[in-house]
Regions:
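N-terminal intrinsically disordered, low-complexity, charge-rich
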Residues: 2-6, 36-38, 58
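C-terminal region of N-terminal signal peptides and the immediate post-cleavage residues
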Residues: 23-43
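Domain-level detector of nuclease and nuclease-like folds
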Residues: 131-257
């Protein structure tokens, strides 16, 4: 028992220290009872919790996000059916509002990576090297291992209501730099089309930050979240029942906006 108490005490100290280093806002350590070995949710700065709560208070909450028919990311010809694919969000990395001649992916890489170099003759467009501190694992990742993540996945957005948008709005969403992060390719793959209830960063100290980014995009495009997403966000941000300001769930699903 003494050893277990010592481990728990060290976890609390580390969580509080991390909060002071990342913002210093006053907050209380909340214990996550979801696992067999209960551990504290890392303390979040008060201003982060306040913004998460403010966003939750005006975000529509649905009982679930149901699949919407007609989604296809690819824009070519289906090899099996020989039919033209739906190209639901337009051609990849083709921003309809950008006329620089450089694709969205390379522009985001150039902005988010450190020690960036470019291929000669591309007018500082095609990134050939660089690294980033992965916002999901906290580890340094080199360009060869980097993937470009849509914080709110395209399929998730489509099922949540983007299926009712016009193509231009969907193209803008797919190329919005506020919804794009250079991350570990393997983590990007494991996340896939998941929302906050199905996937969170492996580093517990980065989970609330991910949730905040997710909510900012959801809010900007007036999309809903599910009840499970709402609860997951509250949990990883250490928001107790008394603090929670999220909307009450609505009956309809995400495919019927």
């Amino acid at each position: 028992m003494t050893l277990r108490f010592g481990k728990i005490r060290r976890r609390v100290i580390l969580a509080v220290t991390a909060a002071l280093l990342t913002g210093g806002g006053a907050a209380t350590t909340i214990w996550d009872r979801g696992g067999a070995d209960a551990s504290p949710v890392p303390t979040q700065p008060a201003e982060v919790v306040a913004e998460v709560n403010a966003l939750l208070s005006r975000t529509p909450v649905l009982a679930n996000i149901a699949p919407a028919g007609g989604y296809e990311r690819e824009c070519g010809i289906d090899k099996k059916t020989k039919k033209k694919q739906a190209c639901s969000f337009g051609r990849a990395w083709n921003d309809p509002d950008d006329h620089s001649g450089c694709d969205t992916r390379n522009r985001v890489l150039a902005k988010q990576l450190s020690s960036v170099t470019f291929k000669q003759g591309t007018r500082n467009c095609k990134v050939t090297s660089g690294w980033v501190i992965d916002p999901y694992s906290g580890k340094r990742v080199e360009l060869a291992q980097i993937g470009m993540d849509h914080i709110v996945p395209l399929r998730r957005a489509y099922d949540s209501g983007a299926n009712n948008w016009d193509l231009l709005t969907r193209q803008r969403f797919a190329n919005d730099p506020n919804n794009l992060l250079a991350v570990s390719r393997s983590l990007n793959s494991s996340k896939s089309d998941s929302g906050p209830a199905q996937w969170t960063p492996p580093d517990p100290t980065l989970r609330c930050g991910y949730s905040l980014r997710y909510l900012r995009v959801i809010d900007a495009y007036r999309l809903p979240i599910s009840v499970a997403d709402q609860r997951a966000i509250q949990r990883v941000c250490g928001i107790s029942g008394q603090q929670a300001l999220g909307q009450q769930p609505q009956a309809q699903n995400g495919g019927a906006r």
